[in-house]
Structures are given as structure tokens and as C-alpha cells.
Amino acid sequence: MVAVLTIAAVVGLSSAGGAALAGFLVTSTDRLGVSTSAGVSGVSGTPTASSPPETPSPAASLPVPDTTETPVAEPVAPEPEPAPPPVSPADTPCDTGVTMSVWAHYDDDLLFMNPRLLEAFDAGRCVRTVFLTGSDAGRGEHYAKGRELGILRAYNTMRGAQGFWAEHSVTLNSGVEISQWSPEDDPDITVVFLRLPDGALNGGGFRATGFVTLPALVSGALASLAPIDGGTPLTLDALTSSLSELIVAYRVDQLYTHVPQGTEWAGGDHPDHSATGTVTRAAWQAIGFPADRVSYAVGYRTQDLPANLSGDLLARKVDAFRVYAAQDSVVSCASAQACLAKPKFGAWLQRQYAKT
């Protein structure tokens, strides 16, 4: 007897329209298993002595489905989408591009990344500037407050409008409290003060603030650092996450800061500068901010490079610095000529070098 094996695939959809389930039917047909009661060629169906009695063959069987189901793996539930981060209390909409910069001291932006800032103002961009230290130079909070006033007045000069500024104390999702200032007539401009202690030219700080510094915090030598006005101490993680939060909250598409530690142009710069550049780099990298939208300002070493500013841009840069310096008793200069004549400051004013 020759058995013929027939295999047919069965495909179906689940009631939910999910993936197809596949099984197989196996059937067997006996080709010689069909007989008649009349025998063959008129020969009687009654058995004779010379032939053995025939055993009736069973009728051909119908295909019987194989009811054994092929094991099917349980569907794997997709991973849930991560919850979106909470909206920052510092969330600030802007209808144009946003230039954010992060600096150590209250004049670093005016000296080392201008006229880039002037160009941002001229283009109608939103400008958000963050200062990490109180720029107190060990001289106390009164001196620091004067420098803050100088910065706000310099920004009035750069934006081409005079007016009062309003302060908003904001506690970020990171837990860090910031002092956020904007002109009453222009929310597109924001200046943020964190007021951490000035680290001094040698990075060792000042007796007045207990010799605690931002470079020590960034290096891990210090667990936390308190603002000079008595706020809650910040850890390095809190500072980094705060900057990341502000980059997102401000919808930044252009970021400026100091040259980070360990890079070619960090040598010879103020330790607060390179520490600020380092923590800012960690902040933008943590959120995947595009590296090609970040520029690092060369600091003190610009004085050794060729002067590259002149004409109207230089005049406007010097004018903004002059307005600031009127509130800074250390670098005060009453005219453009006097500012340009100041050792080191005059050289920095005539230069701007940015690295990527």
C-alpha cells in the first residue's frame, strides 16, 4: 500500500488583527483501499477453494485535521514610553532663536564673547545669560551687587533701551534656587545669578568666603558650595542638572561659555573660567545638545593674539563695558579711551576668539 502525505498550511488572524498563527494539516489517503462487492471481471465475490477469502478493505478515510496546536509565544508587551520631564519653573517661551551663555564672572561675557552678544541682540534673538559666581573677589556682597547692577545696565545699552529690571526667584526642578532678572518691558532678555564664591586668580578662593571655590567643586575636592548670599549649598550634580534644565527650559539653539579644563586654550585662564566651561559642557552633553551649536570663548590668552575688532563693533563693545565698569570700583573707566587704556582689559576689549 502506498501512502500519499498531503501538507496544507493554515493561516489565520487573531480577533484583534494581530500576527498570523500558522499550523499544518496532515492527511493520508490509501489508493488501494477501495473495493466493491461484485469482485473483478465478473468473478463472483464468493471465495473459491483455490483462493483465500478476501478481507474487505476499509473505505477510504476522509482527511482528519490534526487538532494539535503549534505552540505560539506569548506576545511581548512593548516597553512603556518614558514620561516626559516635568516642565521647568524657568520655562520661558521665545518666538525667535535663543542664545544662552554661561559665565564665571559678571564681565566675562562683555570681554570675551562680544560682539557675538551684540549680534544676537541685533538679530532679534532671545538672550539668556547665566553667571555662576557672585564675582565678589573676596570684597563682600556689596561689591558683588554693584557688579550685578553694572551688568543689567550694560544689557540695557546692548539692547538699545533703558528701563527697570524685575527679579524673579525661581526654584528649579533640580532644587536649585536662582535669581532670574528680565527688563520689565522685554521678557526676551534674561540674566541669571547663582552667586557662588569667586575663586580668585589662583583658584584657591578668598578668606572672606572660606577659601571654597567652584574649581574645587568641579574637581570633586569639595562636596558642595553655598552662594555668598546664604542660599542652599549646591552639589556638582545639582549645578550640572540645573544648567541642563535651563538649556531645555529656554529652548536654546546657540550656546556660549568658557573654554573647558584640559583643553588647549584653558592654560593661563582664570580657574573659574575653565571650571565654568567644564560644568557647562557636562550639562549640554547630558541632554544631547548639538555640539556644533556650542562655542567656547578664549579668555585671558586673547591678549597674546592679534587684535581683530575695530570700527562700530569695537565702539559698541567698549561702550557696553564702560557702562558696566561704572559700577565696578576695581576696573572703573569713565570713557572709551580710558577703558582701552587699561592694562589687559584694553587688549581683551579689542579681541574676540571663539573655539568649537
Which stretches of residues belong to each language-model region?
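N-terminal export and membrane-targeting signals
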Residues: 1-9
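N-terminal low-complexity, Pro/Thr-rich disordered segments
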Residues: 17-91
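Active-site rim/loop-helix segments in enzyme catalytic domains that contact anionic ligands
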Residues: 30-33, 39, 83-245, 249, ...
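Short, solvent-exposed loop/turn segments at secondary-structure junctions
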Residues: 79, 134-137, 196-199, 260-263, ...
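Short, flexible/disordered intra-domain loops and linkers
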Residues: 138-146, 264-273
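The feature marks non-catalytic terminal segments
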Residues: 229, 250, 254, 269, ...
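Catalytic domains of cell-wall/extracellular-matrix polysaccharide-remodeling enzymes
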Residues: 239-242, 261, 270-276
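Proline-aspartate-enriched helix->loop->beta-strand connector
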Residues: 243-261
